[in-house]
Amino acid sequence: MTEIDYYELLEISRNSDKSTIKKAYRQMAMKYHPDKNPGDNEAEEKFKAINEAYQVLSDDEKKSIYDRYGKAGLEGHGQRGGGFSGGFDDLGSIFEEMFGFGTSSRSRRERKTYNYNLDVTIEVKLEFNEAVFGCNKEINYKYKTACKPCEGTGAKDGKLSTCPTCKGQGQVHSRQGFMTFAQTCPRCGGTGQATTDSCKSCKGTGYEEVKDNFKVDIPEGVNDGMRIRVSNKGNIAPNGQRGDLYLQVSVKEDSHFVRHDDDIYFEAPIFFTQVALGGTIKVPSLRGELELEIPKGAKDKQQFTFKGEGVKSVQGYGKGDLIIQIKIEYPKALNNEQKELLEKLQDSFGIESKPHETTFEGMFDKVKKWFS
């Protein structure tokens, strides 16, 4: 059975942040919930798989392991297929949106007067060596803080009115047959309150943007696509609560070294005479020079592995390997002297230098018999 990719299952990209993952999960879970698809076994299995995907992708540690090693890497980390342990709160809110259950508790839990997320995600660009060995990086970004005149409401003098669309309930209801469905009010976003006159200071946004900069230690071994959390550097709510800042790592490719997880690959050009004679050559590594023993008769694209010469695992799993792939190169042109020397060398091998003749001779005879 083909393993289902969690990102494909939720129909999101691998660089999606937590809010995108949660939004996709809620949409897919509502679509395939068994109570909306009675008797549909396929929808039920899809619903279980969606929950399994969310349990992994909503957990930073599990997500990092999954991104590197796939589903197999989660074995031994408490992951079980089809479970619900990772999303009871989200499942509860889905029930509320589908059937209108628990409206008052949801309103109490989610009701807020500001209209921005507390967590912030920005991209941090790293050179190849900065990601491999770690570095101290200066971060320049903007965060949001509640507008003081309106206290983050976006309303003039901070005064909000009862939302006319949902009458202060935070939800709107619709009927489909005998079922009644409740959804978050599109106007007030579930707060039950709406702006009549906008605050002049923030023009109704409810926040002000503040520039900030600081230095952060990037750990050794981070990779492209990883996220680093910096606590208490996100947006600030009117009550002083502050979110986190997430650094989305983007690593520039190196012109020679190619990284795959914690392993490093590069191609070493070898002249054909070195392959014929064998010998030792010096090759570059992440931390200096190494000696590579080229055996006589080595093949083009043959790989040689140096254990523990790769990238140090950011999760403490040791170091990856350095894999060198040789590329046999031949002269593009020969002068008269070189041509004469090669012809003499070929003649010195006798019939051994013409393996095609002995191979093809038997094939020619076989083909002739087919038509005789």
Curated annotation (Swiss-Prot):
Keyword Metal-binding listed: yes
A GO MF label: ATP binding
Start-end of each CXXCXGXG motif repeat: 147-154, 163-170, 185-192, 199-206
Domain (J) ranges: 5-70
Protein encoded by which gene: dnaJ
Organism of derivation: Aliarcobacter butzleri (strain RM4018)
Domain of life: Bacteria
Protein name per its UniProtKB record: Chaperone protein DnaJ
Cofactor: Zn(2+)
Zinc finger (CR-type): 134-211
